[in-house]
């Protein structure tokens, strides 16, 4: 019987595969976020006419999902392997199935289903056609063809593939609890993450200072607007991410009512939309540097008319 891949070997295998498909290997973005989609390597790069192919691991924090390290499948922080390709390759689903084969999952020997599940992220004004990928009855991946990001239509169409690494590793290693996953030879997932999960859960549900967080949200929102006034897209987006994480902490703590919740989401969405519009305008001002010369000249001429 062949040796099962460790968590980090799964990551290395996916990195090598998508590198071979022409993706740049980016690093995790250094701000808290609820999903890999919220990284600027996806959110910003999915809009505008320039091509973009990237793959990266993204630790994703969801305070309300924390379970003090006691639930085998619910986590404060999990890891996603994010692939984003623009324009979308026509064979991206076939490429995805090839990646599973490299992980030791033969599509001919397993029940692999693409279950329609259109995707929406209200806090960033983003949506797309999507499918959950189910492997023998367990969701392991989300496929999305973005239709809009930051309230802007995506042209060309961007494809996103988001692997849930903990679920994938649980399946490959045949364990019932994420804490039993072998991260590296001789080191279990739980030996690294159980106590941080407990501490972050305790903070999110019991200890966080609600007044501090409420004040932080206001300050982060104001700073994002100030950055946008100066056309500083990336600093502004950093503060949008901070607003989002602060809201998630408030939500986990039960500090916002249903009505207030909708208001906070709208405020984050409005900021994200301005960031998106400003980013596209800045890329145009720079002359769309990632486009080839012929396409760039043609597009700039058309937009200048």
UniProtKB/Swiss-Prot annotation:
InterPro entries, sorted: aa-tRNA-synth_II/BPL/LPL (IPR045864), Gly-tRNA-synth_heterodimer (IPR006194), Gly-tRNA_ligase_asu (IPR002310)
Keywords from the UniProt entry: Aminoacyl-tRNA synthetase, ATP-binding, Cytoplasm, Ligase, Nucleotide-binding, Protein biosynthesis
GO CC terms: cytosol
MF terms in GO: ATP binding; catalytic activity, acting on a protein; glycine-tRNA ligase activity; transferase activity
One protein family per Pfam: tRNA-synt_2e
EC code(s) of this entry: 6.1.1.14
Entries under PANTHER family matching the protein: GLYCINE--TRNA LIGASE, CHLOROPLASTIC_MITOCHONDRIAL 2, GLYCYL-TRNA SYNTHETASE
Binding partners and assembly: Tetramer of two alpha and two beta subunits.
Protein name: Glycine--tRNA ligase alpha subunit
Organism of derivation: Streptococcus gordonii (strain Challis / ATCC 35105 / BCRC 15272 / CH1 / DL1 / V288)
Gene this protein is translated from: glyQ
